């Protein structure tokens, strides 16, 4: 069965996003503690398409670093080996990402979200980025902040030149979801499954 995978660090709102785009049709467990989803969770839509909620990579509350590395390896292996994935949705915390990326860069390391975004492109999963939690960004700072989000992912600002890839949304308030759903419709059509567009209706 064709799949769309959702990947992202722990606690960025992957499960909340699935609940929002399926209008609650998918039975989703949403938790505040990082690392609530610890193995792939499969949400079948009409027995035709599967949304796969991958475990969050990176920090997990109360979980040894060794286990966190195992989870990351599981995600990479899954994405490399599956041949039925249409594309990936890379969910990031738009509010927190620039600061987190800066911390990684200060340590001389590649930010984990940039690494994942590049990996998704390398394995041909044509990622679409859901920059979630924009309700936490002050309107006056929005443009500058989204430029920083783009930069954190390795995309040259201004962010608006990436409107087919980078979507500011709030799974909580619904802001930006119409544009995001329209992009999902376009992606499934492009993948050769126009009939799946009905799963991402805007009304």
From Swiss-Prot:
Span of domain EngB-type G: 1-190
GO MF term set: GTP binding; metal ion binding
Gene Ontology BP annotations: cell division
Pfam families attached to this UniProt entry: MMR_HSR1
Residues annotated as binding Mg(2+): 15, 37
Residues holding GTP: 8-15, 35-39, 53-56, 132-135, 169-171
PROSITE patterns: G_ENGB (PS51706)
Keyword GTP-binding set for record: yes
Cofactor(s) listed: Mg(2+)
Domain of life: Archaea
UniProt keywords, alphabetically: Cell cycle, Cell division, GTP-binding, Magnesium, Metal-binding, Nucleotide-binding, Septation
Record bears the keyword RNA-binding: no
Family: Belongs to the TRAFAC class TrmE-Era-EngA-EngB-Septin-like GTPase superfamily. EngB GTPase family.
Role played: Necessary for normal cell division and for the maintenance of normal septation.
Name of this protein: Probable GTP-binding protein EngB
Species this chain originates from: Methanopyrus kandleri (strain AV19 / DSM 6324 / JCM 9639 / NBRC 100938)
Gene name linked to the record: engB
């Amino acid at each position: 069965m064709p799949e769309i995978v959702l990947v992202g660090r722990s606690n960025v709102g992957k499960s909340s996003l699935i609940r929002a785009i399926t209008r609650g049709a998918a039975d989703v467990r949403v938790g505040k503690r990082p690392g609530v989803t610890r193995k792939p969770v499969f949400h079948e839509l009409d027995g035709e398409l599967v949304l796969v909620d991958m475990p969050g990579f990176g920090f997990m509350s109360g979980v040894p670093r060794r286990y966190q590395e195992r989870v990351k390896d599981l995600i990479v292996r899954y994405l490399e080996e599956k041949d039925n994935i249409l594309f990936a949705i890379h969910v990031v915390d738009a509010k927190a990402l620039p600061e987190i990326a800066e911390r990684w860069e200060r340590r001389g390391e590649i930010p984990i979200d940039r690494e994942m975004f590049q990996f998704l492109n390398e394995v041909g999963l044509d990622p679409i980025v859901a920059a979630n939690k924009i309700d936490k960004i002050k309107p006056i700072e929005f443009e500058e902040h989204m430029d920083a989000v783009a930069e954190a992912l390795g995309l040259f600002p201004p962010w608006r030149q990436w409107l087919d890839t980078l979507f500011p949304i709030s799974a909580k308030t619904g802001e930006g979801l119409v544009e995001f759903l329209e992009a999902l419709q376009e992606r499934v059509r492009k993948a050769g499954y126009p009939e799946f567009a009905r799963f991402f209706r805007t009304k």
